[in-house]
Each structure stands twice: as structure tokens, then as C-alpha cells.
Amino acid sequence: EKLSEFNAKVPNAYQSQGDKMGFLTIDGGTLIALDGQHRLLALKEVIDNPTEGDYSADVRNDEVSVIFLNHESSTKTRSIFNTVNKYAKPTSAGDNIITSEEDGYAILTRRLIEVDDGVLAESVVNWKNNTLTDKSTHFTTIKIVYETVKLMLKGSKVPEYDFEPTTRPRAEDLDHAYNYVSEIWQLMMTEVKPYNFVLENGSDFSEKVQEARSPESNNSLLFKPAAQEAFVKGVLAACQPQTDDDEPELTIQEAFKRSNKIRWSMSDDIWQNVIIKSSGAIDGGAEGKNRMSLLISWMLLGNKMSDDKKLKVRKAFNEAHGIDIEQNPNKEKSLPEAIK
């Protein structure tokens, strides 16, 4: 029923749109959700069944915007359904981490940033974007926290921590895994000196993190998201046994402490072509991060690294500089000196 058909005085502001506004009365027929089926099912489940949550009883009173389409033919309805779903904007990686209740890595990532129990304050993590500009006032991104959680748990070699992203882990396994990753994160933030101010989260945090990330900073790499992921991967690799029968040469705490001796400036020659492109930008791809992590593990271990792992580092480092050491052994570039 159009608003213009009512025998009531309509304000002048609405009169010109009277044919486009009105009331919809549905009498009979069948309602089919062309889009939002999961949301509809979730609302129905909360309304029909007792649900935990302070506001579950109020859901039945919520107002939801809906677009109604008249079914003219199966062909037209099917076409609309296909178009809506085919061109739907996919959720971002950050959104998936924020909302997933099945992915154990995502659940633990959020716990690391909780107000009461977390290691990181919400304000120091960018929840929306996967990258940080030099002017960003965040320390890292939720995507990088997620990736480090995966690295830590997979590196633990504990079978119960090898989560299937589509199946929610047992509460007990989540608790144990959280204790494990939160301890490593706490060690990183306390033992890696450039990170100490992040936990303090003082009133001057924004200025400090921008200064630390600037290309001129002595520690600029440690504040670039891709390099942060590579850093954690490299430290964890250095803490793995060098052979099947060996004990690790370093504990995670020792590795973080030793990392303070590494030169972390983006302008330092050791990172050129490894994770820093010729343009000066970060190479955030998988190969760049892998090269950086290998080089970090070498600098932390030095000659304590097994020969086969050192060969892998030598190959990756030289390939970054356009040298194939198997075909041109005489052109091999020496690895940067390991820390002492």
C-alpha cells in the first residue's frame, strides 16, 4: 500500500516520494531466503532454543532490514540468487579471525588480545588491515598474531595443537595451547629489548611505535608485519634440534635474548634482496619471509647449525642475490657473520 494512497495528511517532505514508500502486508505464500540463510538460521536458533548470553532473550525484539522480491519465475529468482552469491564480497582474513568459533588458532589469537587475560592491549593491534604504514600507531596486525600462533603451535610438535581450522578444539586443549603461546609471546615482548615499550602501552606509545618503524630506525624491521612473522619463524627454527637425536641448541628465551645482537635496520646490507627489495620496500611474499627466517636462524645458531640446514640457508641467501651456488660455486656470497 503506497503512502500516497492513504487518506491522511502526509508531511510535505514525504509527499514527493509517496509512490515509493508504504506498507507491505504478506498474506500466505512461501518465504525463501535468497541470501543470508546462515544469519536467518542463527536468529531462529537463538529465538527458538535457550541460548547462553546476556542478551539472547532480547534477540526476538531486534529489527532487521530485509529486501523482499516478488517471485515471477524460477528463472528470474535463480538468476538473482546466483548473482547475489557469485559477486558477494568475501570476508577478509581479519574478519575471519575475529569471528571464527571453530578455528583454534583464531580463538587463541583473540585471547592474546583480551583485556583481562591477554598479552597485548587491543589498542596496539590493527584489527582491520594486514599491513601497517610508517604512520600507523599500531604495533602489529591481527593477521600476524594469528600466523605467529600457528607457527608456535606447529613448532611445538604437540599433536593436540595441530588444529583443524573447521573443527573447534576441546576446551582443555585450547587452554593448554593458550598457556604455551602466551608464554612465548610474553618472552618475546620482555626479552627483545625494542619491544619492551609495547607492553607498557604508555601515553607516548603512538610516537614511540612510529619512530621505531621509520626506515631510519635501528630496529625498523622488527616493526614491519611481514618481518615480524619471519622473525618468529626464524627464532623457532633456531630452537629446533639440529638432528633427530640432538637436544635443541637454544631455548626460546635464549634465542630471543640473542636476537638483540642482530642488526635490525631496514637499511642494513644483510637484509638487502633477502626481505628488502631494491626499491627499499618490504618483500612480504612467502619467499621473502622464508629467506629472512632462514637467515635469522643462521645468525642465532652459527656453526651449531647442522650442515644440511646451513646449506639451505646458503642456497636461499645466494638465490636472493641471483646466484645459483650449485652451478656457480665460485660466485657464492658468504653468509653474514653469526652473532657471538
Regions found by a protein language model. Give the residues of each.
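Accessory terminal alpha-helical modules
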Residues: 1-340
